[in-house]
């Protein structure tokens, strides 16, 4: 089973370890994702996000560039085992050469500081997908999760605030560049703004089904149908809060069976063609049945048992 995963936060963990003076080897580490585990899991493609937390106090562009630097150094260190991709054809070439493909993405469009020039520079550096937001409203759009807001369970969606004029300009430029617009983390209104103001397929790199787990980070059935009509894809997120519907968030679980349940819902509402994986590995905690990227056979078994056959 060849695996595609649209989202992980491994780059930020590698950068954090370097900053702490305890650098990790990407070949083999204690992270959810490393090269050895990717090979064991039979991965064809892993997307690596340069993750930026606007609330950290760091310069967001510097953070993104430093994580992109980590990505490039990892690729240079293991050229016979993993290689970056810039076009779809690169995936086939890497597979033919026995290499895993790695796609560079950005999680937090606010790192561009509103500059289309920075966006174009990120594309030149190899970024091929970007979320407009993370968990903060920024100069491009509103997010659904409000990091500084009082905790409410389940998280209520933002149906009032969407893309700004600058955000609309970013969507247009991303489409011109063929950089994928990623709507994970985006507010509900922002999602529909993307639907109305874009023409190409977009992605929700790590979002599940709100009908099964009522967190605002998940997609409604109406959203899923709109994405399917456009030829979009959505990545199944392994985070406990986005999979389970327990009244107490601390009781939420992450199991292969729950992931397969969301896959079946995506198939029922939007069709099997839109389903991808978006593990969020190295960006999520809690008890995970699939606790690293080598454990994908557990999901393959669960999909067969649940007759999702994705």
Where are each of the predicted segments found?
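N-terminal hydrophobic targeting/anchoring segments and the immediately downstream early-domain regions
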Residues: 1-156, 199, 214-307
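Acidic, glycine-rich active-site loops and adjacent beta-strand->loop/helix elements
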Residues: 52, 208-209
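Short, catalytically relevant binding-site loops at active-site mouths
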Residues: 188-189, 209-211, 240-243
């Amino acid at each position: 089973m060849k695996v595609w995963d649209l989202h992980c936060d491994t780059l930020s963990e590698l950068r954090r370890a370097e900053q702490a003076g305890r650098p990790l080897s990407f070949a083999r580490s204690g992270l959810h994702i490393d090269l050895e585990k990717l090979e064991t899991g039979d991965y064809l493609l892993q997307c690596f996000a340069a993750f930026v937390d606007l609330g950290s106090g760091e310069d967001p562009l510097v953070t993104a560039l430093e994580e992109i630097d980590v990505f490039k150094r990892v690729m240079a260190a293991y050229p016979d085992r993993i290689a970056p991709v810039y076009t779809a054809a690169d995936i086939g070439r890497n597979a033919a050469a026995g290499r895993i493909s790695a796609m560079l993405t950005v999680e937090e469009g606010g790192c561009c500081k509103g500059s289309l020039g920075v966006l174009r520079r990120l594309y030149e550096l190899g970024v091929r997908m970007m979320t407009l937001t993370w968990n903060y409203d920024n100069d491009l759009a509103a997010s659904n999760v409000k990091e500084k807001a009082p905790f409410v369970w389940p998280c209520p969606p933002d149906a009032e605030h969407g893309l700004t004029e600058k955000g609309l300009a970013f969507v247009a430029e991303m489409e011109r560049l063929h950089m994928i617009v990623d709507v994970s983390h985006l507010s509900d209104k922002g999602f529909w703004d993307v639907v109305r103001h874009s023409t190409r397929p977009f992605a929700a790199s790590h979002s599940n089904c709100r009908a099964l787990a009522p967190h605002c980070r998940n997609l409604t059935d109406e959203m899923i149908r709109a994405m399917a009509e456009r030829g979009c894809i959505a990545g199944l997120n392994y985070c406990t809060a986005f999979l389970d519907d327990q009244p107490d968030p601390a009781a939420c679980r992450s199991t292969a069976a729950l992931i397969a349940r969301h896959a079946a819902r995506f198939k029922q509402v939007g069709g099997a063609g839109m389903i991808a994986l978006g593990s969020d590995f190295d960006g999520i905690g809690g008890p995970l049945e699939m606790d690293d990227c080598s454990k994908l056979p557990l999901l393959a078994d669960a999909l067969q048992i649940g007759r999702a056959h994705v």
